[in-house]
Regions:
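Generic structural signal for well-ordered beta-strand positions
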Residues: 32, 87, 157-158
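Active-site glycine-centered loops adjacent to acidic/histidine catalytic or metal-binding residues
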Residues: 117, 143, 312
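Glycine-rich phosphate-binding loop of actin/hexokinase-like ATP-binding domains
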Residues: 132-190
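Short hydrophobic alpha-helix segments
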Residues: 35-37, 90, 160
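A charged helix-plus-loop insertion that forms the helical arch/lid used to bind
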Residues: 85-96
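General beta-strand structural signal in soluble alpha/beta enzymes
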Residues: 112-116
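ATP-binding/phosphotransfer module of carbohydrate and carboxylate kinases, centering on a glycine-rich
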Residues: 1-71, 81-83, 102, 106-110, ...
Length: 328
């Protein structure tokens, strides 16, 4: 056994709707080996856990063996760190409460921790990204949903049940759009993918002006942002409304938390100035005046394909080491 490498590696796992990626990561955040498989290939949780555990074992055995790996950290949507579970995910085929930490721990013989993907992103940004050295910041992930995390006093805030920081499900419009969570008027219903597309359709309905959006068979935030670059007035108006609503929601959030920065991640952030300029204006118009001008808007500078894995590796270092053997 090489004593220089004992327990100086962890496994980071990123579970998304499309793919499950896993990697061996060292203490400096270097990804040493990586593999993946399509998440959708395993609609039954037992088969999924088998595929993931088998993949992790093969990766470990091909890269130094079990004696070098301390633990496993997992990033997943709808995950609850306190429960070690994915809870009532609206998008995965696995329904109810899935005790993923326990299922994998029993198969791998390693300590396993699972956390919400936004919480994991915050850990990664603090350790390796643009939040390094900060004690108080917010992470916002914009994509198919709106994920968020409060990082304050040097750590992720979980709340009593592990659901703290869910700004996506705060109300920005009384009796507004129905959200996937079942409530009405949630910020997510206006700023995530489906909400942006709905706003685009509303803009087109309200005006008879010509727009290339009318000729697009399948609208997406990326297509709309591309049309913004071409000067399409309705596309620009779509992101103006989206940004304005986002900025209002963030102003409420920041007025309570008093963060040093808000860090943005996710595919929708590629809209750039078309989203962020109206968001920043609305934020400045509504945030508590004592912190106006002090909260930085930052975009994550970590590699998008590695961000969640790196955050999951930080989570893995935090979990107590597990062994199948009882020490005397």
């Amino acid at each position: 056994m090489n004593e220089g490498t004992v327990k100086k590696r962890v496994v980071g796992v990123d579970i998304s709707l499309d793919a499950t990626s896993y990697a061996i990561v060292d203490v400096r955040g270097n990804i040493l080996a990586k593999d993946s498989f399509p998440t959708e290939d395993y609609p039954e949780i037992g088969a999924y856990v088998s595929a993931l555990s088998d993949g992790i074992v093969k990766l470990i055995e091909a890269n130094g063996g079990y004696e070098t790996v301390r633990s496993v950290g997992i990033s997943a949507p709808s995950a609850n760190y306190k429960l070690g579970s994915i809870v009532n995910s609206p998008n995965f085929p696995w329904k109810g409460v899935i005790p993923l930490s326990a299922l994998l721990r029993d198969r791998l013989g390693l300590a396993v921790a699972v956390a919400n993907n936004s919480h994991v992103v915050a850990l990664g940004e603090h350790a390796f990204g643009c939040a390094h050295g900060m004690r108080d910041f917010i992470v916002i992930t914009l994509g198919s949903g709106l994920g968020s995390c409060i990082f304050t006093d040097g750590g992720v805030k979980l709340g009593s049940d592990g659901y703290a920081g869910e700004i996506g499900h705060t109300c920005v419009h009384h009796d507004g759009r129905l959200c996937g969570c079942g409530n009405k008027g949630c910020l997510e219903a206006y700023t995530a993918t489906k909400g942006i597309i709905r706003t685009a359709r509303e803009v087109m309905t309200e005006s008879g002006e010509p727009s290339k959006m009318r000729r697009v068979e399948k609208l997406t935030p990326r297509v709309i942002s591309q049309l913004c670059e071409e000067g399409d007035a309705m596309a620009i108006e779509t992101f103006r409304r989206t940004g304005e609503t986002l900025g209002l929601g963030l102003a409420n959030y920041a007025s309570v938390i008093n963060p040093e920065a808000i860090i943005f991640t996710g595919g929708i952030i590629r809209a750039g100035k078309w989203l962020m300029e109206p968001a920043k204006k609305a934020f400045d118009d509504h945030v508590f005046h004592n912190i106006k001008g002090k909260v930085k808007f930052l975009t994550s500078d970590l590699d998008e394909s590695e961000r969640n894995i790196l955050g999951a590796s930080v989570l893995a270092w935090e979990v107590k080491e597990y062994s199948l053997f009882i020490e005397s």
